[in-house]
């Protein structure tokens, strides 16, 4: 079995005007995360080279904020061109919030392979975690991404206080979108966040992966944020549960597993690493 590894570069961090209750990048909460408007492009290229060295196939360019404006779009396209010039064989993923058809067309022209815009949770539960934009705006952005020919990376976050009915509704919406890959994140409590929820139990987290694979049999199920914190020593059981992709290295504002540990463990388990999209 091949495992797809993806790395993340937080190319514009913090200061987001949205009020998502689970997110430390929101300007509505005081957190000690690293904040910057633009990361130096040379630094991003170095990170892309490291991602490639760490067996990553996907490299995700993430910007904080509600969505794209002209300036941000131009910057993301410049980054995409620079990475492609210096690093071969990486599939570029853009994660830049709410976007329209024209913006997504520009990203595709710049060499972006896939657009990541998570629904996060069910349509019904979403107003409990965010009031500054709607679930429908997220869903529509995904439809636009598909329309322009971008592959779709769409998932969400569990452990926000949602019910089992919410989880089923959320996965039904994902099934409707039929994404190429679907990230599963697990909420990590933070004293500065307005949302107060305990960590999910490892068994519950593994069952979420199983249920997601059942509902999205054709998608790469990617276990992302919270993997190490929630599952701890059981984190490599995710592959038996149906996952076929993980984030390698650090996340947006939290530390990830050491890439060398992930790579060594996966090799010991008999896995190889995806080097092309299939």
Swiss-Prot record:
Explain how, and how many, cofactor molecules are bound: Binds 1 [4Fe-4S] cluster. The cluster is coordinated with 3 cysteines and an exchangeable S-adenosyl-L-methionine.
Q: Where does [2Fe-2S] cluster bind?
A: 60, 95, 153
Q: Which reaction does it catalyse?
A: (4R,5S)-dethiobiotin + (sulfur carrier)-SH + 2 reduced [2Fe-2S]-[ferredoxin] + 2 S-adenosyl-L-methionine = (sulfur carrier)-H + biotin + 2 5'-deoxyadenosine + 2 L-methionine + 2 oxidized [2Fe-2S]-[ferredoxin]
In this record, what's one Pfam family? Radical_SAM
The keyword Membrane belongs to this UniProt entry's keyword annotation: no
Protein name, please?
Biotin synthase
Q: Which residues bind [4Fe-4S] cluster?
A: 16, 20, 23
Quick check: keyword Transport in the entry? no
Q: Which HAMAP family match?
A: BioB
Q: Which parts form a coiled-coil structure per UniProt?
A: none
Oligomeric and partner information: Homodimer.
Q: Which pathway does it take part in? A: Cofactor biosynthesis; biotin biosynthesis; biotin from 7,8-diaminononanoate: step 2/2
**What EC number(s) does the entry state?**
2.8.1.6
Q: Which residues form the Radical SAM core domain?
A: 1-227
The gene is bioB
Q: What does this protein do?
A: Catalyzes the conversion of dethiobiotin (DTB) to biotin by the insertion of a sulfur atom into dethiobiotin via a radical-based mechanism.
Question: Can you name the source organism?
Answer: Campylobacter lari (strain RM2100 / D67 / ATCC BAA-1060)
């Amino acid at each position: 079995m091949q495992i797809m590894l993806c790395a993340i570069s937080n190319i514009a961090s913090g200061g987001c005007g949205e009020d998502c209750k689970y997110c430390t990048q929101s300007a509505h909460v005081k957190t000690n995360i690293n904040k910057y408007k633009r990361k130096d492009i040379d630094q991003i290229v170095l990170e892309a080279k490291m991602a490639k060295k760490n067996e990553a196939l996907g490299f995700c360019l993430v910007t904080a904020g509600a969505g794209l404006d002209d300036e941000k779009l131009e910057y993301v396209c410049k980054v995409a061109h620079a990475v492609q010039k210096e690093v071969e064989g990486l599939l570029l993923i853009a994660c830049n919030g709410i976007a329209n058809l024209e913006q997504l067309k520009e990203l595709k022209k710049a060499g972006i392979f896939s657009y990541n815009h998570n629904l996060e949770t069910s349509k019904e539960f979403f107003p409990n975690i965010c009031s500054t934009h709607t679930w429908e705006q997220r869903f529509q952005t995904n439809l636009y991404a598909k329309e322009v020919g971008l592959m779709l990376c769409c998932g969400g976050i569990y452990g926000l206080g949602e019910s089992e009915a919410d989880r089923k509704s959320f996965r039904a919406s994902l099934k409707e979108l039929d994404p190429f890959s679907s990230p599963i994140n697990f909420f990590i409590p933070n004293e500065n966040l307005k949302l107060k929820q305990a960590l999910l139990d490892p068994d519950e987290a593994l069952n979420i992966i199983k249920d997601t694979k059942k509902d999205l049999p054709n998608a790469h199920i990617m276990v992302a944020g919270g993997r190490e914190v929630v599952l701890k020593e059981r984190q490599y059981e995710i592959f038996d549960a149906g996952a076929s992709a993980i984030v390698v290295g650090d996340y947006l504002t939290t530390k990830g597993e050491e890439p060398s540990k992930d790579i060594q463990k996966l090799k010991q388990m008999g896995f190889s690493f995806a080097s092309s999209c299939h």
